Curated annotation (Swiss-Prot):
Cited Pfam families: Hemocyanin_C, Hemocyanin_M, Hemocyanin_N
UniProt keyword Acetylation present: no
UniProt-annotated location(s): Secreted, Extracellular space
Binding site for Cu cation A: 198, 202, 232
Entry's family note: Belongs to the tyrosinase family. Hemocyanin subfamily.
Species of provenance: Scutigera coleoptrata (House centipede)
UniProt function note: Hemocyanins are copper-containing oxygen carriers occurring freely dissolved in the hemolymph of many mollusks and arthropods.
Tissue expression from the record: Hemolymph.
Stretch forming the signal peptide: 1-18
MF terms in GO: metal ion binding; oxidoreductase activity; oxygen carrier activity
UniProt-annotated binding residues for Cu cation B: 353, 357, 393
Glycan-modified residues: 318
Name assigned to this protein: Hemocyanin subunit B
């Protein structure tokens, strides 16, 4: 008997009456007007509209706008730009009607940096009631020159200027340089969807969100600090899984700021309209003090955070102590480490996460002596391309590991689900592979470039890019239920089985590398049954159409369009096959569910993106039960009867297919 299943978004809730977060009305008409505003961003060859006047009564607002120069790149990591970005976003977010929102957007657009405008407009649009669910162009559609190398942009420009109509440029030819081991990872580091996801996550959960905005919008960002920890923790784990798949050691931690950064990086990115060229970082440079920030400040902030972690309490701005040992502790710590405006004491705990991005991005010209532009680490849209991003976030991750390791390990009683036994787990691919073998391959997709960019002045163009893809597969979970019918939450993780030296991981080391693949609910009848779930229904990912489709045709079924690319759900593996453990843990729906309205959820990717306007619909800590130190050396010692695992081999076929 196959049990009924439903995704967590559908089940971990108790919704009564009308939707709390209904989608906006007149979506098509509103989307058209919003696209008309955005069509001018980064497009000098679109006819400009008349500069609207500042309305009476708004003069004080505009005293704080126009500070960041037009030719610069906006950085959410650079705190000096936060006030202006927040002012712009709040001014648009608090417009009393949709028409007023559009009017305010046009006024703001003419007066601030375009890069900053796109971010502020996106934050406002995502969080306004009357624009909820309306799809906007993603960052790679507005700024394709932040995602496509400059040589590709030049080829596009030359093709159009020579008279070609709708040319197709092939950007799939990337070569591995044996002198640069990280060149094996271009398919991951420079993936359009991965970097677009990272940018959009920071739109959904902006660091500049604060209590005053919650009061204005009546929207509480539930567990935002914990989401910052977990999403970036998962990015680091996924990066290390790709490194192991390519025969590379796991990334090192960037933690001693006096040591040379061994890994250089050349972005090969230029904003064509302005000539802004992302800085190249040679091997073995050492970060230096900035005029506005010293490394000693960074060390002081780090030490204060670690002191709070080890004491189990943090110092609030009003002088009171805030416990880090209760269920809110990880969220409080997440806001402190991200250095968001929801940090309980920003003057004391500082801005260690964001300013490390800034200090690393200016490593070759820290004081601006040579007039160089900043590196990829400076920009949220480009930072995840740089291997240093993962080394830095591994340091950030270690702050959270210190915290988690200080918590009491889960006992067998904590972990056991009395009536439920998982008897067997299998993973079955759809491509004819043997059981518990899944194949990956390369897939070609098309990035569409609209007319009006400096490189598409005379027409549209298309660019063929290549990304990882995998065959579809099913989880097959054999369950025995010793009681009556149960609603069960199934948590699915994947972790590499062997390290770079081909030694099997100790369980505590492995659980820290676990990648969440899915989290879903099934109604399990009494007795024996089999629960099946398809990989395409993952609670972690969003569909490929959100990256390579048109904003006009994308589904508006969820408010966020947030999540990891579906095609990167599993690591690449290799031709011989890389072994991973898939773990499945069953927990009680009755204990886990949180009263939450489905209409408010980020429908594509609950695990990474949460609920935009409501409670996170899962009571357990993110990453449970692998989030804490275990008093066990192996999974067999750790597991209870409601857990099981299987070894899965991921093989890369080397095939290239068209999407």
């Amino acid at each position: 008997m196959v049990a009924k299943w439903c995704v967590l978004a559908m089940c971990l809730l108790v919704a009564v009456g009308a939707d709390k977060c209904p989608r906006a009305t007149d979506q098509e008409a509103k989307q058209k007007r919003m696209l008309e505003v955005l069509q001018h961003v980064n497009k000098p060859y679109v006819a400009e509209t008349k500069d609207p006047k500042i309305p009476a009564g708004s003069e004080d607002v505009f005293k704080h706008l126009g500070i960041l120069e037009k030719h610069e790149v906006f950085s959410l990591f650079d705190e000096r730009q936060w006030d202006e970005a927040t002012t712009a976003a709040v001014y648009m977010l608090t417009a009393p009607s949709f028409d007023e929102f559009i009017d305010r957007a046009e006024i703001v657009r003419h007066r601030i940096n375009e890069d900053m405008f796109y971010y502020a407009f996106s934050v406002a649009a995502v969080h306004r009631d009357d624009t909820r669910g309306i799809n906007l162009p993603r960052i790679h559609e507005i700024y394709p020159d932040k995602f496509l190398k400059h040589k590709v942009i030049v080829e596009v420009k030359n093709s159009i200027n020579s008279g070609q109509e709708d040319p197709l440029i092939d950007a799939t030819h990337e070569f591995t340089d044996l002198r640069d081991p990280n060149s094996k990872l271009h398919y991951f580091l420079e993936d359009v969807g991965l970097n677009s996801h990272h940018y959009h996550w920071h739109v959904i959960h902006p660091a500049v969100w604060q209590e005053s905005l919650e009061e204005l919008t009546h929207q509480h960002k539930d567990r935002k600090g914990e989401l910052f920890y977990f999403m970036h923790h998962q990015m680091v784990n996924r990066y290390d899984a790709e490194r192991l798949s390519n025969g590379l050691p796991r990334s090192t931690t960037f933690e001693n700021w006096n040591d040379p950064i061994e890994t250089g990086y050349a972005p090969h990115l230029t904003i064509d309209r302005t000539g802004y060229r992302y800085q190249f970082r040679p091997d073995n440079l050492v970060v230096r003090d900035l005029p506005e920030l010293t490394k000693n400040h960074m060390r002081q902030w780090r030490d204060r955070i670690l002191y709070a972690v080890h004491r189990g309490e943090a110092l609030a701005a009003n002088g009171s102590s805030v416990s880090l040992r209760d269920e809110r502790g990880i969220d409080v710590l997440g806001n402190m480490v991200e250095s968001s405006l929801q940090s309980i004491n920003r003057p004391f705990y500082g801005n260690v996460h964001c300013y490390a991005h800034v200090i690393a991005a200016r490593i070759a010209d820290p004081d601006g002596k040579y007039g160089e532009d900043n590196g990829a680490m400076y920009d949220v849209a480009t930072s995840a391309r740089d291997p240093l991003f993962y080394q830095w976030h591994k340091f950030i991750d270690n702050l959270f590991h210190e915290y988690k390791d200080a918590l009491k390990a889960y006992s067998s009683e904590d972990l056991t689900y009395n009536d439920i036994t998982i008897e067997e787990v299998n993973v079955q691919g759809e491509g004819g592979s043997p059981a518990n073998t899944v194949t990956t391959f390369l897939e070609n997709s098309i990035v569409h470039l609209d007319e009006g960019f400096s490189f598409t002045a005379r027409g549209h163009a298309r660019v063929k890019v290549q990304h990882l893809q995998h065959e579809g597969f099913n989880y097959q979970i054999k369950v025995n239920n010793a009681g009556g019918e149960h609603k069960v939450v199934f948590r699915v993780f994947l972790a590499p089985k062997y390290d770079e030296e081909h030694h099997e991981f100790d369980f505590n080391e492995q659980r820290g590398m676990a990648i969440e693949l899915d989290k879903f609910v099934a109604t399990v009848p009494a007795g024996s049954s089999t629960v099946e779930q398809h990989s395409s229904k993952s609670s972690v990912t969003q569909s490929n159409d959100n990256f390579y489709g048109s904003s006009a045709t994308r589904s508006s079924e969820n408010h966020c369009s947030c999540g990891w690319p579906d095609y990167l759900l599993i690591p690449k593996g290799n031709h011989q096959g890389v072994q991973f453990n898939v773990y499945v843990i069953a927990t009680s729906y009755d204990e886990d569910h949180v009263e939450s309205d489905e209409s408010c959820h980020c429908g594509d990717s609950l695990s990474y993106c949460g609920a935009l306007y409501d409670k996170y619909p899962d009571r357990r800590p993110m990453g449970y039960p692998f989030d804490r130190h275990a008093d066990a050396q192996t999974f067999d010692e750790f597991k209870t009867k409601n857990m099981n695992s299987v070894t899965v081999t991921i093989k890369h076929t080397g095939e290239v297919k068209d999407a």
